[in-house]
Each structure stands twice: as structure tokens, then as C-alpha cells.
A protein has these predicted regions:
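Beta-strand-rich binding/interaction modules
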Residues: 1-2
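The feature marks proteins involved in alpha-glucan
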Residues: 5-85, 90-95
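Aromatic-lined carbohydrate-binding/catalytic grooves of carbohydrate-active enzymes
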Residues: 110-155
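Conserved beta-strand->loop/alpha-helix structural units within folded catalytic cores of enzymes
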Residues: 154-170
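Short amphipathic alpha-helices and their capping/turn segments at secondary-structure boundaries
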Residues: 71-74, 105-115
Length: 170
């Protein structure tokens, strides 16, 4: 199927028999360049994952039945900022990539106990090459899936705010 370009620069498609994309469904765009088909992740994807078998990257349809339950409406950052800079994947003792949930459970309480008022999370956007330290970004609107789901990151932010800690995303 070919995308149709609209007057406003947006491309769209209607596929007969397909009424909606399903939650969890993976997708990508196939671009033809110099006669070759190239798989591309849409620039505005908000959740991107890597296939464990063939290591390809795809966008994922990711919408929740109910909105995320933010609990930080009353949060206001402190006037004095004392920043704890961290990398979620490296902030643990085990020899594996850490997760948002592990950070929330194991590191965040120590950050609060030490009196930090802000958490600067490094390399948060999706990037395919882990050794790049997260600075070869491929998807600016997607948090790195190797650390967990978007809801896991939101839960970490809620927990930080509950402890009086502001969150900065690098």
C-alpha cells in the first residue's frame, strides 16, 4: 500500500479491511530509495522496540485503555537544585541493563535520602546502539524501551515527585 501525501505535508493511508491498529502491534514504513526497499521507523513513534530474534527495530502501537494515573499535580520543584545525574541502564550492581522499575525501587530511595532535589536522567530517548551511551538518538519522542515501558518511566517520575524530586530528561 502506498501513502498519500496531503496538502499539509502529512501522509496517510487507508487499508481496506483494517479498521484500527491494535495495541501492541508493531509497524514500520517501507521507503523505496534507488529501487531498494528500506524499513524505517516513523519519526513521531512514541514507543519503539527491538525484536529479540532478528534485532530489527519497529514502532509499536501503544495506547492505554485508561489515561496514566499521574499523582503529582501538587508537585513543585524546590528553589535550590541539587542534581543527581544518572543513567538508568547503568545504575545497578548486576551485570545487566537496569530498568525504570529497578531504579525506582533500588536507587530512588537513596537519592532522596542523600537530599537531592532533582534527578537528571541521561540517554532517555530511544537509541539502537547501547554503547553510544544513548546519544545516537533515533526516536526523539520515544523513551528507551530497553529500560521498560512508557508507563514504567511515568511511574518512576510519579515516585520521584512524591519524594520531592524534580525530574530532568537529558
Amino acid at each position: 500500500y502506498k501513502l498519500e501525501k496531503k496538502d499539509n505535508g502529512v501522509f496517510e493511508i487507508f487499508i481496506p479491511g483494517i479498521h484500527t491498529l491494535q495495541n501492541g502491534q508493531r509497524y514500520c514504513a517501507i521507503v523505496v530509495h534507488d529501487g531498494k526497499e528500506l524499513d524505517r521507523i516513523p519519526a513521531y513513534a512514541t514507543y519503539v522496540v527491538q525484536d529479540e530474534k532478528d534485532h530489527s527495530w519497529n514502532a509499536v502501537v501503544h495506547h492505554m485503555e485508561d489515561p496514566f494515573p499521574w499523582t503529582d499535580e501538587a508537585f513543585r520543584p524546590k528553589k535550590t537544585v541539587f542534581v543527581y545525574e544518572c543513567h538508568i541502564g547503568m545504575a545497578q550492581q548486576e551485570g545487566k541493563v537496569g530498568t525504570y522499575r529497578e531504579f525506582q525501587e533500588n536507587v530512588l530511595p537513596r537519592v532522596a535520602a542523600l537530599g537531592y532535589s532533582a534527578l537528571q536522567i541521561m540517554a532517555i530517548q530511544e537509541h539502537p546502539y547501547y554503547a553510544s551511551f544513548g546519544y545516537q538518538v533515533t526516536n526523539f519522542f520515544a523513551a528507551s524501551s530497553r529500560f521498560g515501558t512508557p508507563e514504567d518511566l511515568k511511574a518512576l517520575i510519579n515516585a520521584a515527585h512524591a519524594l520531592g524530586i524534580a525530574v530532568l530528561l537529558d
